[in-house]
From Swiss-Prot:
The UniProt record lists the keyword Transferase: yes
Keywords, ordered alphabetically: Biotin biosynthesis, Pyridoxal phosphate, Transferase
Organism: Microcystis aeruginosa (strain NIES-843 / IAM M-2473)
EC number: 2.3.1.47
Protein name (Swiss-Prot/TrEMBL): Putative 8-amino-7-oxononanoate synthase
Length: 385
């Protein structure tokens, strides 16, 4: 009889053979535009700290002050002993920032998606999601028990065809999409999705994780960027990317948020967000409001890199994520290593995370022109044209 765990070693060998095996890399000290990685100083193009707030002294001071006042942990679920005034202050600030009636904060963005999706739909319902949606949206859909179907990436035509074919068989229908797609950098056709939702009587949940703080005139996300403010939808986002903290949020009308507060298992049955993370996220919103030049500098950096690499097959992007597809996982690893040797940290992204391997570069507001020029030169020397 085989040992019950013997298959794990075989599976690890398969991952190695396919060049899919992953290992952690240890960064010393704070993150930022330049990092210390395993004894080397590298320019960091793998961070989602888009505005460079995670190491901002005001963020750190806010986290320290909250820890001194409230302690290191929230000490319970929000419905029991884990709710503090700073949690509600953050939720109200997010609601105002997103131009929504109310908001609810989860302990992570992943939990926000799982909890929200699973309490909105069930076995009698239909979910239609973009094929390139984030793992948290896909897993939330599976866990809900609803019938789940995917439409071709950013295809309004395929989405409507599936609505025509299936919508009438189900009680409720939920449309799911990232606004900025995390492994491509492109943006969903939000206005078209909302128009179809009105025609076919669907709820809409958008994941603003990579748009919050980055997209739109005020940095509120793609709902603003696409001119869809005031439309009826549910917005989810994260506090761990441009906001430089940890946690996730959901915004919408007051009744929806009240319903989520009463039904979302990943909010009800978990400890509240730590005081430090909560206070840091609240400070980030204030910095974003007061310093629009950070976001402007980020987009200047994005546009500079795009203009210098227009001869390469970069995937279309208006966000801080720029991707160069390559032939296979082995080539992705090889090119990432070449860049590492030139002082650039940009890990290879491989299946099953993405269908086709690629190098993924993320811009930050704190990258200097010199950092960007090193990246452009290194890519030119490393990538086949």
């Amino acid at each position: 009889m085989n040992h019950p765990y013997s298959w794990i070693e075989d599976s690890l060998k398969t991952l190695h053979r396919a060049n899919w095996y992953r290992r952690v890399k240890t960064i010393q000290g704070r993150g930022g535009a330049v990092i210390e990685l395993e004894g080397r100083s590298l320019i960091n193009f793998a961070s989602n700290d888009y505005l460079g707030l995670a190491a901002d002294e005001r963020m750190i001071a806010a986290a320290i002050a909250a820890t001194q006042r409230y302690g290191t942990g929230s000490t319970g679920s929000r419905l029991l002993s884990g709710h503090r005034d700073l949690h509600r202050d953050l939720e109200l600030a997010i609601a105002s920032f997103k131009n929504s009636e109310d908001a609810i904060v989860f302990s992570s963005g992943y939990l926000a998606n799982l909890g929200t999706i699973t309490c909105l739909v069930g076995q009698k319902d239909l979910i239609l999601g973009d094929q390139y949606n984030h793992s948290s949206l896909k897993n939330g859909a599976k866990l809900s028990g609803a019938t789940v179907k995917e439409y071709r990436h950013n295809s309004l035509e395929d989405l409507e065809n599936q609505l025509l074919a299936h919508r009438h068989h189900y009680r409720h229908c939920l449309l799911l999409t990232d606004t900025v797609f995390s492994m491509d950098g492109d943006i969903c056709p939000l206005a078209g999705i909302l128009a179809l939702a009105e025609i076919y009587n669907c709820m809409v949940l958008v994941d603003e994780a990579h748009a919050t703080g980055v997209m739109g005139e005020n940095g509120t996300g793609c709902v603003e960027y696409c001119g869809c403010q005031g439309r009826e939808l549910i917005q989810m986002g994260t506090l761990s990317k441009a906001l430089g903290s940890l946690g996730g949020y959901v915004t919408g009308n007051a009744k929806i948020i009240d319903f989520i507060r009463n039904r979302a298992a990943t909010w009800i049955y978990t400890t509240g967000l730590s005081p430090a993370d909560t206070a840091a996220a609240r400070m980030a919103l204030e910095i974003i409001r007061l310093e629009p030049e950070r976001r402007q500098r980020l987009h200047q950096n994005i546009n500079f890199v795009k203009s210098k690499l227009n001869n390469l097959n970069i995937l279309p992007s208006e966000a801080a994520i720029l991707c160069l597809p390559v032939a296979n996982p082995g080539q992705a690893l090889e090119l990432s290593q070449k860049l590492l040797e030139k002082g650039i940290f940009a890990p290879a992204i491989r299946p099953p995370t993405v269908p086709t391997s690629r190098l993924r570069f993320t811009a930050m507001a704190t990258h200097s022109l010199a950092h960007l020029e090193v990246l452009v030169q290194s890519i030119g020397e490393s990538f086949p044209t």
